[in-house]
Regions:
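P-loop NTP-binding core
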Residues: 1-256
Length: 256
């Protein structure tokens, strides 16, 4: 059975796209068939795999507009793993928030599009935009669960509380089975008191849904996208690669 996981946080710069790319690649490395959907108009997930995003004419934007089928928009990321696939995004997606508002059953468009292909994959990972608009609502309506990356910074808990409120609203009206897959700490620096305090603070409030894996602040993680590679191919022995492999193990275990 396929699992659809939305990776979301309305705060930017928390490691959401980094987590989307590297979790998907590590799941593929472990033999899982993975579809990664870029739902962010910045298209950083798309360019993070080396694709020229603005040269693509079949993206998630055209899928949501129902101009192309979802199968037509899927790109194999065979330079990385033969069982890893991507639905790309580019700047065209920026207009989708406004366009979707006028559509009938606008919150369910992505879910409807995924239905014919959902069972072909072990995991479908959706990289949500850093906002709680219609694109994120579509992703969460289509998802089984939400994975939340949190940067180890002072305002981490404030952003999380807003996201949890949004998830509760979607549970009430659109997707009653949606749940929080887990919270993963990113950009963790054990040398700073702030990182330690943030981890302890969030654990005190949400202990039951926090992943054991903590993603460290790692130079190689920051470098990898400029080479169009996930961390487990760019530097497979780096601390970032090891951390995302451990996170993939936890996600696989949770799916059993």
């Amino acid at each position: 059975m396929s699992r659809v996981i939305a990776i979301a946080n309305q705060k930017g710069g928390v490691g959401k796209t980094t987590t989307s790319i590297n979790l998907s690649a590590c799941l593929a490395e472990k033999g899982k068939k993975v579809l990664l959907i870029d739902m962010d108009s910045q298209g950083n997930t798309t360019s993070g795999f080396g694709f020229e995003k603005n040269e693509l004419d079949k993206t998630i934007y055209e899928v949501l507009r129902e101009e192309v089928s979802i199968e037509e928009a899927i790109i194999p990321v065979e330079e990385c793993f033969e069982n890893l696939f991507l639905i790309p995004a580019n700047r065209n997606l920026a207009g989708a928030e406004i366009e979707l508002v006028t559509r009938e059953n606008m919150q369910h468009i992505l879910k409807k599009q995924l239905e014919p292909i959902k069972d072909e994959y072990d995991f479908i990972v959706i990289d949500c935009p850093p906002a709680l608009g219609m694109l994120t609502v579509n992703a969460m309506t289509a998802a089984d669960s939400v994975l939340v990356p949190i940067q180890c910074e002072f305002y981490a808990l404030d952003g999380l509380s807003q996201l949890i409120y949004t998830i509760e609203l979607i549970q009430e009206s659109l997707n009653p089975d949606l749940y929080i897959e887990g919270v993963v700490f990113t950009m963790y620096d054990a040398r700073t008191n702030l990182s330690l305090q943030v981890v302890e603070n969030v654990k005190d409030n949400l202990k039951q849904i926090i992943y054991k894996t903590i993603i460290p602040r790692n130079v190689r993680l920051a470098e990898a996208p400029s080479y169009g590679l996930p961390i487990n191919l760019y530097d497979k022995r780096s601390s970032g690669a090891e951390a995302y492999r451990m996170l993939a193990d936890e996600v696989i275990e949770n799916a059993k």
